[in-house]
């Protein structure tokens, strides 16, 4: 991952990975790659962004995390994403093993025994691709997760997606058009944490008063 390879009960806040290329080459079913973290269990992600990244793996690939594994035996609780987004990311998985796994998603490639909660977040313009495996059910793409394993569920609260090439595993998120992402509609729905910036919403930072200060100085 761009921030960490492995997270266990960790909290990651105010982090962005932009214009990066990440690749995981180990060819087995534990191969994970994501813009922020490769493998996470019980992680808390807040105000994190992944933009214009290229993720390549040989099993699990995600815009944020390659695999989210919240097995109750670990005792660290379920993962959450709040005020997060992925935009313009290309995520691909290509296994050399015909019995292998090839799963990619806008937030996570694989969810294992997870009740993932995603709040006030979105996925936009995700290019998702899988190759190589001949096993039905383990070659898949999805908006927020490529594949849900075991008792995994996605709980969305005020979430959106668009231009992902799929509607699978979107939970209860609402699909929006490219125009709605570009014209400020989605930014308004996401509230004060976001502001329109170019073609899609980005985090709303401190106000810039430099022009006001300059005028007062005159």
Annotate each predicted stretch with a short phrase:
Residues 1-218:
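Predominantly extracellular beta-rich ligand-binding scaffolds that present long acidic/polar faces
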């Amino acid at each position: 991952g761009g921030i960490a390879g492995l997270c266990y009960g960790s909290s990651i806040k105010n982090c962005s990975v932009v214009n990066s290329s990440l690749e995981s080459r180990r060819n087995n079913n534990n191969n994970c790659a994501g813009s922020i973290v490769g493998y996470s269990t019980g992680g808390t992600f807040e105000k994190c962004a992944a933009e214009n990244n290229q993720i390549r793996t040989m099993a699990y690939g995600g815009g944020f995390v390659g695999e989210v594994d919240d097995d109750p035996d670990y005792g660290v609780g379920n993962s959450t994403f709040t005020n997060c987004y992925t935009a313009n990311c290309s995520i691909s998985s290509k296994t050399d093993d015909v019995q292998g796994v090839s799963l990619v998603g806008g937030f996570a490639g694989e969810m294992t025994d997870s009740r993932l909660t995603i709040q006030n977040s979105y996925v936009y313009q995700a290019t998702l691709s899988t190759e190589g495996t001949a096993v039905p059910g383990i070659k898949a793409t999805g908006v927020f997760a490529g594949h849900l394993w075991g008792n995994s569920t996605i709980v969305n609260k005020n979430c959106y997606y668009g231009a992902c090439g799929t509607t699978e595993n979107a939970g209860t998120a609402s699909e929006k058009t490219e125009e709605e992402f570009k014209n400020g509609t989605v930014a308004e729905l996401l509230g004060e944490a976001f502001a329109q910036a170019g073609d899609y919403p980005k985090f709303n930072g401190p106000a810039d008063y430099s022009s006001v200060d300059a005028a007062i100085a005159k």
